[in-house]
Amino acid sequence: MLIDWFTVFAQILNFVILLGLLRWFLYKPILQVMAKRQAQLAEQWQTATDLQAQAHQALEQYHQEQQSLQAQRASFLAAARAAADEERQRQLLTLREDIQAQREAWEADLHQEQRAFFHTLRQQVSQQVVAIARQALRDLANATLEQQVVARFCEQLQHLSPAQRQQINHLETPPEAVFIRTAFPLDVTHQAQIKQSLATTLELDGTPIHFVTVPELGCGIELKLAGQEIVWGLDPYLDQLEQTLAIATR
């Protein structure tokens, strides 16, 4: 049997052409559709995977937010309890301080009232003692006491400082009169004694001298001329006694 090589090659060529046609018109579109479908499936799978990951992430975030909210709630509750306790303690402390302050103020007022009462009482006693002493001296005044008062006043005139004498003797306006005020009437002898002391001490140049009785002066003598004043009596000693008693009874 003879082989027809031409036929063989023709069949092979036909087969190759058929394969090419099949591949080009049948397999390639099928492969393209399959590739496209596979790409769509892969894309859908990736989308599903992404959605699942997003869902998982959202769920995880939700759990985290829940935990954060729980922690914040616990923190807020703890802070509220702490603030309430602190406010209660502050109010209790304020109440105690107010009570203590009121108590101290009441005690201070009580002590102040006690001190004021005893201070007033001591002052009244001191003033009464001095008043009794003044009245006793007035009641006991006699000729001997009057003589001693006049003598002390004349002695004070003799011991005036040069500055005092200069001030009295060189007044801008000469005095029209000299007034001698006493708590008791002076007899002629005592008046003459005082006039003599004034004449030897001051430059009065015939200025009239008037004697005036003022019982309120107590045991003392007061000289006044042109605004100048010379005083001697027991009142300064009694005033000093009153001040000493006032200081001692504070």
Curated annotation (Swiss-Prot):
Its main location: membrane. GO terms for molecular function: proton-transporting ATP synthase activity, rotational mechanism; proton-transporting ATPase activity, rotational mechanism. The keyword Iron-sulfur does not apply. It is found in: Cellular thylakoid membrane. One of its GO terms (cellular component) is plasma membrane-derived thylakoid membrane. Signal peptide: none annotated. The chain crosses the membrane at residues 2-22. The keyword Phosphoprotein does not apply. F-type ATPases have 2 components, F(1) - the catalytic core - and F(0) - the membrane proton channel. F(1) has five subunits: alpha(3), beta(3), gamma(1), delta(1), epsilon(1). F(0) has four main subunits: a(1), b(1), b'(1) and c(10-14). The alpha and beta chains form an alternating ring which encloses part of the gamma chain. F(1) is attached to F(0) by a central stalk formed by the gamma and epsilon chains, while a peripheral stalk is formed by the delta, b and b' chains. Belongs to the ATPase B chain family. F(1)F(0) ATP synthase produces ATP from ADP in the presence of a proton or sodium gradient. F-type ATPases consist of two structural domains, F(1) containing the extramembraneous catalytic core and F(0) containing the membrane proton channel, linked together by a central stalk and a peripheral stalk. During catalysis, ATP synthesis in the catalytic domain of F(1) is coupled via a rotary mechanism of the central stalk subunits to proton translocation. This is ATP synthase subunit b 2.
